[in-house]
Amino acid sequence: MRVSHPGFRIPTVAAACLLGAALVAIIPSSTQTAIANGDTRVINLHHAHTQESISVAFRVNGSYDAAALKKLNWFLRDWRNDATTKMDPRLFDVIWEAQRGVGSSAPVRVQSAYRSPATNSMLRRRSRGVAEFSQHMQGRAMDIHVSDVSMARIRETAMRLQRGGVGYYPDSNFVHLDVGSVRAWPRMSYDQLARLFPNGKTVHLPTNGQPLAHRQPSAPAPPCRACA
């Protein structure tokens, strides 16, 4: 382990929820895969506000490392008041997998991680975009940026994981990732989402609210319709 110290909720209808539950049940768990494979996973983070950096193996031989998680809990504290919480370790798996999926090797820049209730209330007074019961308050979310790939690619890769929430903020150049319910904002168009999930098996909903798995069969199309 290496540490340096230089100084909305999206509503869904009941039918969509049932569909989501069914699809989640058939999506392989990368956590289980990591345990089965005996993975060792290292996460490299840099905090935008404290200017601290950390490189730590949060998984060793497939299991979470308690000492590493404790260090990450402090690193990802509410930087405004140093309040800490127990971060959900599944979040580190999501970030590790998303970064690996896009081929990024740069440290993950953390814009926001844990938020104490006091901080969340303060931010809600400033912006309507801050959820009252934010996943940040539960230690289940991070807002991140990586310098060597576009945030659009991080967004797409994280959405494919279907492991929680994905919020895309291109104007602020970061992506929100959490391990709450599977959802994404802003929603993609039907065509955009279909390119990510050509088989239609996704919990995500497009802007028209119509689940891809419910779309009508179409006539056979030429192979490889720019679906990369």
Predicted regions located by residue number:
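Bacterial N-terminal signal peptides
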Residues: A14-I26
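Boundary at the C-terminal end of the N-terminal hydrophobic targeting segment
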Residues: S29-G38
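Catalytic cores and adjacent binding grooves of peptidoglycan-active enzymes
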Residues: R41-H46, V130-A228
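Loop/turn elements at helix/coil->beta-strand transitions in domains of secreted/extracellular proteins
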Residues: E52, S104-V108, Q162-G165, N173
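Short, surface-exposed glycine/acidic/tryptophan-bearing loops
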Residues: R59, S63, Y114-A141
